[in-house]
């Protein structure tokens, strides 16, 4: 199976990396090298990998916070380093992991800060700016909280506000570092679904770093897989899942990663194999069933069996 590790041609609407190396200068530390990725519109990309693999470093380099150690990043054919800070702020918006403390600002005022690249130093909102703020509040489902103080919101609501602020910048690219890191499970699902919908419906390229591997596979259009001392690979979720890459990239201190349960576990003693003949649309259901390990019995089957299952 082949994955995207080639040099891409420059597309008019793409953010592209060519032979990119990322890391730090003092002292010089290379985190990952020879990165060749192509980020297109209307797609949600999720970067996954173990701790310390370079997910945040890649995001910070793509957004211009860190300089590449080698190679190039281009946006619509223009090298990233050639963008002025003001022009870059109309191209890429960032949502960081840690939410800021803004005790004196309302939700509306926080979202309106996203218009700063267009309003200038004094931040005077024109009628068109106000219309943008109103629209993005509606888009993320937080308009009913517009007059409330930001610090009075739940963590999930605060994250929606920060996403709305990023949308108010009206940039084609939105980068988020662990956007669901401190949220409960229902809120994590809601945020990831929201981002997937925004990317598809608003013609955005959204790039997320995340430790939530199951949700990444559920929502992403493309997975970017990173691990220390391994090449960065990318592919659609089904390709990555069907390969052995998850087990290889997430191996930790000799513990094997279970791609069905998305967790580390003790290796089970195998009985005789059973082949399940199932229609393709039932594959996710069977994978979920296998991950529960309910099929394991104390006495292995006496012979291999074929079990046909129809939808």
Sequence positions of predicted segments:
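Conserved ABC transporter NBD signature motif
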Residues: 71-79, 88
């Amino acid at each position: 199976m082949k994955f995207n590790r080639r040099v891409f041609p420059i597309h008019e609407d793409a953010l592209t990396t060519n032979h990119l190396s990322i890391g730090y200068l003092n002292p010089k530390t290379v985190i990952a090298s020879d990165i060749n990725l192509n980020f297109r519109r209307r797609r949600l990309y999720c970067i996954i990998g173990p701790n310390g693999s370079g997910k945040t470093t890649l995001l910070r380099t793509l957004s211009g916070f860190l300089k590449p150690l080698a190679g190039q990043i281009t946006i619509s054919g223009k090298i990233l380093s050639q963008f002025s800070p003001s022009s870059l702020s109309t191209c890429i918006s960032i949502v960081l992991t840690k939410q800021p403390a803004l005790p004196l600002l309302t939700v509306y005022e926080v979202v309106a800060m996203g218009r700063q690249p267009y309003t200038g130093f004094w931040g005077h909102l024109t009628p068109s700016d106000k219309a943008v703020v109103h629209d993005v509040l509606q888009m993320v489902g937080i308009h009913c909280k517009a007059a409330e103080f930001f610090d009075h919101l739940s963590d999930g609501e605060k994250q929606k506000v920060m996403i709305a602020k990023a949308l108010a910048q009206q940039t084609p690219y939105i980068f988020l570092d662990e956007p669901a890191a401190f949220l409960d499970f229902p809120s994590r699902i809601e945020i990831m679904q929201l981002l997937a919908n925004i990317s598809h419906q608003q013609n955005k390229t959204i790039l997320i770093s995340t430790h939530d591997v199951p949700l990444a596979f559920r929502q992403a259009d493309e997975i970017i897989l990173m691990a220390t001392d391994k090449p960065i690979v990318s592919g659609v979720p089904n390709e990555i899942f069907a390969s052995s890459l998850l087990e290889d990239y997430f191996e930790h201190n000799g513990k094997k990663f279970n791609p069905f349960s998305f967790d580390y576990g003790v290796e089970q003693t195998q009985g005789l194999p059973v082949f399940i003949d199932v229609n393709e649309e039932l594959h996710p259901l069977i994978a979920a069933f296998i991950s529960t390990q309910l099929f394991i019995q104390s006495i292995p089957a006496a012979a291999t069996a074929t079990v046909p299952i129809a939808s």
